Amino acid sequence: MDSKKGILVAIGGGSCSGKTTIADMIYQLLRKKLKVAILPQDNYYKPYKNKSMAQRKAINFDHPDAFDWKLLWSHLDNLLMGKTVAVPMYDYVNYTRKKETIEIGPLNVVILEGLMPWFDERIAKLCKLKIFVEATGEERLIRRIERDWERGRDVASIIKQWREAVSPMYEIFVEKMKQKADLIIPWSERHEVSTNVLDFAIEHLFRKHVDPN
């Protein structure tokens, strides 16, 4: 019998594809009956504290090497064992980790949301359900400009990063995540049906996990 007390649901997809929106919709439904939390993959960027601001700005944050996979896997494993972890917080202005952390756990369901949440094989093996959210490149770019503008970025730098890192990394790494996804959801403004189905499916997966009979 699996010794883990919780289950992991991973939601992946390109930058600004709607992953966070869908993760939050599922969370709002599940929280009424289970202990659940969203764990953003972005929180597990490497800290790069020994690099200058100019060096940190030059990092390709859309490449798998930008993430601290070992820490992420360790935290997920502990959460699924029913433990509490101190989740790092990411500072988007200074391109590093914040000093403060957030404690989460114990949980029934962990929702891991990010660009390529099951890229690491250790994490892929922990997943009970892998969901890929798909949106057109044009739609994702428009949302990216809107989002990063609100974070204090200028449009020229946003488009430059999109051309040099975001778009090519999507083609090389992120899009390939679809091959191992259990479910692919095309983005639309209305997701009530799909999220309600996922709510039912995830609850069923958890109940089956804790009581296989």
From Swiss-Prot:
Its main location: cytoplasm. ATP binds at G13, G14, S15, C16, S17, G18, K19, T20. The keyword ATP-binding applies. GO terms for biological process: CTP salvage; UMP salvage. Disulfide bonds: none annotated. It is an enzyme of class 2 (transferase). Gene3D superfamilies: P-loop containing nucleotide triphosphate hydrolases. It catalyses: uridine + ATP = UMP + ADP + H(+); cytidine + ATP = CMP + ADP + H(+). It holds the Pfam family PRK. SUPFAM superfamilies: P-loop containing nucleoside triphosphate hydrolases (SSF52540). It comes from the Bacteria. It is found in: Cytoplasm. One of its GO terms (molecular function) is uridine kinase activity. CDD domains: UMPK. Belongs to the uridine kinase family. PANTHER family: URIDINE KINASE (PTHR10285). This is Uridine kinase. It comes from Mycoplasma pneumoniae (strain ATCC 29342 / M129 / Subtype 1).
